[in-house]
Amino acid sequence: LIPVTHTSANGLPLGSEADHSYRKILFFDCGLMLRLLGITTGDTTTLATQILTSTAADLVNKGTIAELVVGLEMLHYMPPNLRHELYYWVRLSKNSLAEIDYLLPSHLQILPIEVKAGSQGGMKSLWSFMREKHLTEAIRCSLENFGSFSHTDKEDRDTARHVSVIPLYAVSQIIKITTSDRV
């Protein structure tokens, strides 16, 4: 089991504001998770592949499985000389629900990563988090092809915000982005 720890994400390092009483847990294997969910019909590897390519029947847990795959793949591609910790953010307010699936340090900034199990879905939590934390870059990992979204935030002095889209099959690119040297 791999913990993903809540952080307030007000700056780096992300662990400095970690709240270990709020954690999401990743199973170390998709097949094991599907088995525990009682989804045992046929080959679970094939089922996981179908889920991530949107050819499987619509499952309630599809988003959770996509988050699991992204988390495990990010850990797999992290350089071995770095400490492997995953963080997420959630607004802990009774009247407002917002969550960012993963946060990574990238070039002395926080990089929010939103995971979507399909090719559509709103990004209200992502835009809100970026505004609150004064960030201009983020990643959306989904079934979409490579692409990007730009947004001029009228509520924050017309700040330009940019979201890069990375397909679920290319999660390794996220780690390349966060660890590459900028020119």
List the predicted regions and their residue ranges.
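Short, solvent-exposed loop/turn segments at secondary-structure junctions
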Residues: 32-33, 118, 145-146
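Short, solvent-exposed amphipathic alpha-helical segments in soluble enzyme
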Residues: 42, 128-132, 155-156
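Arginine/glycine-rich "motif VI" loop of SF2 helicases in the C-terminal RecA-like domain
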Residues: 79-80, 129-136
